[in-house]
């Protein structure tokens, strides 16, 4: 295990909302039936009372999503810089208060790059140009058995997708034993860019390095997903 200490201390809300909704629909034969659809709601992030972005999200792990978004956009240098994250679903907002801010937000957000992917994500600053400077470790050696075990670990997970469909999933694993893997984090969201940000936030809270981890996502690996994986220091990315 490559977990380090001490972990950052951030005052955080534990906001929750229903993740699926039951609705009445008509099937192909005109019969009425009940089915489930995933929720999708807006979440506007305020950094020291300044509006940064509005995300459309399932809402399953909003505090981790906010932290991971700020991390991957480099709007905050360290979790120790953050005093609190308070999510309020009545106002669809997340208020982030910092202890200190070393980032010039105006300069960073002045340049935007629209990345590939159906959601057309946006990345701030010259991050793409700086990707060449990121050096990743070799990572864990993977066998075919380990990859099969990883995919199976995702498949058997109790997921929103099984109930309603229309969501993406991301997960991180570590090697365990000869050909085994252990699931560390599993997140579903309406966009996989949100799911990877949420996992990034959870890893930051745990002060966990990505150097010995494997990252899994449903759907294709867009440029945004690859960039975020590199930022998290994860050397192995897999998709189904």
Report the location of each language-model feature.
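Feature captures the catalytic cores and cofactor-binding loops of soluble hydro-lyases/lyases
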Residues: 192-240
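Intrinsically disordered, low-complexity regions enriched in acidic/Ser/Thr/Pro/Gln residues
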Residues: 2-186, 190
